[in-house]
Amino acid sequence: MDYMIFATVSVALMLSSISATSIAVAFPIITSYFMVPLTIAGWIISVYQLGFTVTMPIIGKVSDVFSRKSTFILCLVLFVSASTACAFVDNVGLLVFFRLIQAFGGGGFMPSAVGIISEEFPETRQKMIGLFSSILPIGQIIGPNVGGWLVDSFGWRSVFMINLPLGAVVLLMAIVLLKGDERKEGSIDFLGAGLVGGVVAFLMLGLTFLGYDSLKGWSWALFLASAISTALLIRHEKGAKDPILDIEILKRKPFVAANLYNLIYGGAVIGVLSLIPAFAASVYKMSASECGLLLLPRSIGMIVASIITSVYIMRWGYRWPLVLGSGATVVSLYFLSKEPASIVFLYGIMLFIGMSVGVISPTANNACIELLPQKAATITGIRGMFRQIGGAVSVTIATLIVQTVGDPSRGYAIVFIVIAISFVAALPLIFMMPSRPGAGIERSECSLKRLKPTTKERVQ
């Protein structure tokens, strides 16, 4: 039964993965359909990351406090309903809105599922979470190829409609198989989540407005609003009963290092690499089906590397796989920035990128949880939030650069080089994170004893 539960949450994550990669393939067609600038169309992708940013830490807390089964099912219903609505809109503004709602559902899959897996497999948590991470590239194999075929055969709306029958099957599995659990004490920091969303949204809007002469004046006001929201967030979180961002924990170097690394990782993998189909369509003149096929070697590389890393992570530790994966990503981005090469060479680069990401993902996941394993779902939500912030902001910056430069080939080259440099700058952060399984637990427990008590604890 435990492995059937693992299969249920894994299929849900795969559904989210299929949806994300299908949209990446459909993105050039959707941009042409609505006839909007790239910076506006980019919100179809970046608003999804924004929704994840707000939702993941909330759902992590909700999953820790309330029933994991109810939380998981609620997220699934929200995701499928919004996906269906996206298929019927005829306005880019409405599409962006329903993509945000879709993200509110999809953003809950990972933290709630990790909480479920951590409870079902306490003795083999590292291995099972690593295997769970390998589900993402399976969806990334199916999504681009099926999505490319759907777009070429039935139009871009079909990539949203496919979530309805698949989601219904997963919903039935969840209702039947998942175990109910008792409510625990705690509260949800909705204001904190709203302030996090405000910080990122104001920053993204400010960056978008920089691309328009008539709106540039508003950019600085939006940047100021983002800064003010940041100050309000810090002040609120210091006094919150159950803060969405525990400021005292985030002051500790290992948590700071882990989250900054995930911010950069999200900017590259969730953000910029989601624009690969748009890059291939504009620079290499590929069709939707060809763009989908281009993502196949990346997904295969992710699966193979993720499974191998998950199996041997107890032996290898965390740091050197992260160094290896980061270095390989830098090399891949450098070659992507060069003049358009042969299609075969491009496929090779995508395979190499996939292997790099496959090494990084399960390692970074477990390195974060290692710092506070008793709060696995919450830590997963915070880690995911930083990744999504990186992804959302990087898409906004990337589309601004490409639109400003004018030449897609040169614009994307600049984007790839910027991300490569950020990965090089992030290498020292790896050596501030736990070195191996078990290394962070004792330090975390000792450090947590020295942390200031929450408002709730002071009252008690």
Question: Where are these predicted regions, by residue range?
Answer:
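Helix-breaking motifs and short loop linkers at transmembrane-helix boundaries and internal kinks
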Residues: 33-35, 67, 88-94, 122, ...
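Paired small-residue
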Residues: 78-85, 90-102, 344-352
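Hydrophobic transmembrane-helix bundles of small-molecule transporters
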Residues: 152-261, 293-294
